[in-house]
Amino acid sequence: MAYTTKVNGCAAEKADGVLNGDHNKEKKDPYFVETPYGFQLDLDFVKYVDDIQKGNTIKKLNIQKRRKPSVPCPEVRAIPGHQGVWTSTESLSSSNSDDSKQCPSFLLARSHVTSTPIPRPPAPLETSPTFAVSENRQLLPPPSPQLPRHNLHVTKTLMETRRRLEQERVTMQMAPGDFRRPRLASFGGMGSTSSLPSFVGSANHSSAIHQLQNGYQGNGDYNSYVPAAPTTSSMGSSVRHSPLSSGISTPVTNVSPMHLQHIREQMAIALKRLKELEEQVRTIPVLQVKISVLQEEKRQLASQLKSQRASSQNEACGVRKRSYSAGNASQLELLARARRGGGELYIDYEEEEMESVEQSTQRIQEFRQLTADMQALERKIQDSSCEVASELRENGQCPSRECKSVAVGSDENMNDVVVYHRDLRPCKDTAVGTVTETRNVGISVTEAMLGVITEADKEIELQQQTIEALKEKIYRLEVQLKETTHDREMTKLKQELQAAGSRKKVDKATMAQPLVFSKLVEALVPTRDQMVGSHVDTRESCVGTSVQTSSVGTSCHPDCKNQVVGSELPMNWWVVKERVAMHDQCVGRSVETCDRSVGVEVSVCETGSNTEASGSDLTLLKTNLNLKDVRSIGCGDCSVDVIVCFPKECTSRSMNTEAVGQEEAAVMAVPHTTDQHTSTNLERVDQCTNTEAATLVESCTNTLLSTMDKQTSTQTVEMRTVAIGEGRVRDINPSTKTRSVGVGTVLSGNSEFDRPCAVKTKESGVGQINIQDNYLVGLKMRTIACGPPQLTVGLMGSRRSVGVGNEPVGELPEESPQPRVASGMVTGLDHYIERVQRLLAEQQTLLAENYSELAEAFGEPHSQIGSLNSQLISTLSSINSVMKSASTEELRNSDFQKASLGKTTGNHLEYTCKCGGLRSGGLLNVQPSQPEVEAETAEGKHSRGHEQFPMQGSTLPPVNLTDDQIATGLYVCPNNENTLKSIMKKSDGNKDSNGAKKNLQFIGINGGYETTSSDESSSDGSSSSESDDECDTIGYPPEEEEEEEEKDHDTRGMAEGHHAVNIEGFKSARVEDEVQVPECEPEKEEIRERYELSEKMLSACNLLKYNIKDPKALASKDMRICLNTLQHDWFRVSSQKSAVPAMVGDYIAAFEAVSPDVLRYIINMADGNGNTALHYSVSHSNFQIVKLLLDADVCNVDHQNKAGYTPIMLAALAAVEAEKDMQVVEELFSCGDVNAKASQAGQTALMLAVSHGRIDMVKGLLACGADVNIQDDEGSTALMCASEHGHVEIVKLLLAQPGCNGHLEDNDGSTALSIALEAGHKDIAVLLYAHLNFSKAQSPSTPRLGRKTSPGPTHRGSFD
């Protein structure tokens, strides 16, 4: 036993020579580098690897030095005496090199010791708990402080080896070999899960082979060492470079390149293992938590065992107290070392375990009880452990002798220098330590058989399994985290790119917005300041008329204003304070109820005692009780049934006092509400007063004149084109059209509308008799053709005869207008017809001279002029009867300009009409009855929302002109083509927004009737069939309207917001007989179906009114529900294809009555796609609704939807059928920025209109200041778009603009000329070429050279 202990001590001495020897002072050996995970790396090995990298390889050496055999080190861990020595090949320590320094006899003895437990593995498992732990933890090395270190003998050996290698390098001529170090053996187990490295088995074979090759002679135990190789080789690979080839003791004899490759592989494996250990360190906090949980479970299990066995084991616990505690402490230390052997999983588990054992008395008592239960089992375990130890020592006695003998004679340098000198002292020290270790092993073996320890081992295994599972999960989570992080970074980059693009687009879209808003502000401020004193400013700015009227209204009623001003400012604030105090009781409905039945409530109070018997009194008291209930409930919509239950009880109790108090409170609220309504009525009356002074006719006239000037420049450019064109070009229309434009400079822009209409009217051939038999629609259309002479401004004589004389119409007798009209019509029409006949004859003569094919079609001009004369006489006679009994609604609707119709001071109806490009305004004298005047004065225009006028603030005094003045005014310009060509007649009186087909008839040059219609209408449609559909109004179905037309006149034009008088209420059969205006007509004019907001909408509007200034309140849940209700109802009414303009007008009036801010908010409300009601109305071509929205003066015309389009851009693509719709579109263009770019491609409204061939929209945009040279994101201009799509007329129109630049290039370097050539449009290419090269050389008077042939191409183009 003692000898065996010394053998073990030799091993311990070889392993822990530095720790237990005199060199304990040296913290680090110069040939070691300690890694962060407890491993030690040999510096010679590092240098060796560097030499291999540098190419300093070593040739094979023939050294006569005997080599020491290497031993598989991991099996030493099975011996309890070697638990303090770590010799596993999985670490980077120098354990293998230390083993190589041991004596051969001891190595052989160790080989017997290690090979003993292998045939019977159950014995170590039962006897040693340390072995059980180490079997499951062979991948985990011990902590770095307990790792073995080299002594000075290593240094001397390495120096000697280097010297020999340098000598052999010079002398030997063999192939270069590789140099091998024993440290590489430690890399084999880094990535392996087996208990031994992959090359341990081959190491034993190679060591034996090298011994035989080098002439080594072993003792009798050599054979026992060799069988250990196959035992361990089954667990590893066949490649093993044993420590014999390390070069520490002897140089390498035969090292192949395969060995170097293996070294590199093991280095890579080691680095991977280090990386894995670094990842495992991150799981330490999680594992600490899990260990604490397992400890708690262990404590609970132990407490259960304690409660079960506490009765029978008290005395035994007292006997085993100290010994078990000591054993438990050592065992826990060993378990902790085994757990943290890998280095990266080291946690303060050992310290926590020791502290818990020492400090927690409860845990000590648990172990005591478990120890007492297993005393008999401990004795058996100790006996078995003693037997096992004796067997191990017996097996190790013989090799110990051999080891000593071999060690003395094998290595001379080790005996002389270091080994022999230190074998004396360290062996004694190690023997002392071995005794202590033996005791620990005995105690640990005893504890291994306890039930608690077995459960603890199971728990540890479960913990390890959990740790491994957690490692895998953490690895997967890290991979997912990296992928997610990468995806988020990519998403952020995409979002940043999108944000940058959106910012760029937003910058493009909003560049022009500040200018527009600043212009509006400048227009509003001066108009408000100068409204009181001057009407000239009001004429200049039409936008601010509504604001100015309110200020004038205050001046018109100074008494009321003083009262309102004195009471409104403080009363509003007082009302707000009272509402705040009594908000929970009354919101305002009670106030309205008090207003409606103030007197009834007072009477009920006086007769309160009779309320119990009379049923009528009960109904009266309902109002009072409603007040009380409403106040208690608040803003909620309480049902009527709930309220009805209370009046019975209240009346029986005769609550007269409460009723009196409520009535008094209601009386208090009456003046507040009355003041507010009074002020509202006053403002509306003032607006009507200002409407009478409308002088917008003059401003519109100026606009037409400026447009004519622009068209004059267009004609000169076209004349230049003619001069440059070749033979083919001369035959094409552009040359001839330019000459015709030169003749009629003023009306060239409007000739496009007139020519096709004239041709189609001729083909229809509608006769005079048929017109009289049809509905008044046809007659009304003809009144427009012959109507302008009636205007007092000077266009139509027949109109003038209606209002003969300067005296007011109201003073004339009712019978007098009829004969006067008849006489005036005859004189005015004769002169008018003569002039028309002469002009038509001249036109036909010119056409016949220039075009031979037309001469045959015309025939005798004089014969057709005679038929035209009869047609005009019959038409004007029928018109005469209509004009005396109806208003000028249809005249206004057929106008080319916006109609401004209002009341003047002399009870006149003002209107404007344009015919043939000229603009005229006049006053049509109508005789309204006195009740109508009084009703209009009292109620104002606001009470009739459908009769409001779009433009207010200017007035025109009535003027009566003579027939000569009318005739001269009709032909102001001798070169007026439109005037010479045709007189417009409209074949339908459509005033609603149903999008019906509209036909226009013109009296052509050749004397026949020509019909033109929109794209949707057919050329052969009669006026009677059209009028059947168009006579339907918005508010009435067709059946109801026929009954109303037979009885009285209803109001028309509601969708447009104009004052309208019914002219369709008379059937065609009654036109010639009915001349006198009925007296009851103005009174029945007010009959119309009104649309009112629902209670839910009203409550939502009131809630929005009080919270519209508070962004936080708007974001609340209640407000979101409120806004959703408003949005749904508003879009349902205004944004449908079949939307009713009258309903939209009533809604707008109701919103404005609540608050202007509420009106602004609701009209500009957008849906999920960013579209407002204006977007939808323009898209559906509901231009009457567009007119109502624009008249509200709160629309944001430049609002872009998600696609980046504004209402102006959508209007550029809309289909316009009637001229009044075109007027609305022009008004829309004037209200916004026509040069705004879409956010998608940067296109403007002009580019969109040009691309789709909308020449009418192009003209309107150019008139409103659209820039021709703006380029989109691709660099294209409107001229390039027109050249690409082949729109010749649009190209001419664009080139006629003064600043049109044809030299611009797009992003591809293409110009408009190159694009036209690529598309094959040669005529456009010639125009562009002429414009680029000859536009400045041509004189402006050139167009007059071809005047003789000018009418030909113009009218030929119209017929084409």
From Swiss-Prot:
ANK repeats: 1117-1154, 1169-1199, 1203-1236, 1241-1270, 1274-1306, 1308-1337
Major subcellular location class: cytoplasm
Superkingdom per UniProt: Eukaryota
Reported effect, N1201D: Impairs KIF21A binding
One of the GO biological process terms: negative regulation of Rho protein signal transduction
Positions with biased composition (Basic and acidic residues): 938-947, 985-995
Motif Nuclear localization signal 1 (NLS 1) positions after renumbering to this chain: 65-68
PANTHER family: KN MOTIF AND ANKYRIN REPEAT DOMAIN-CONTAINING, KN MOTIF AND ANKYRIN REPEAT DOMAIN-CONTAINING PROTEIN 1
Annotated protein name in UniProt: KN motif and ankyrin repeat domains 1
Organism of derivation: Mus musculus (Mouse)
Gene name of this polypeptide: Kank1
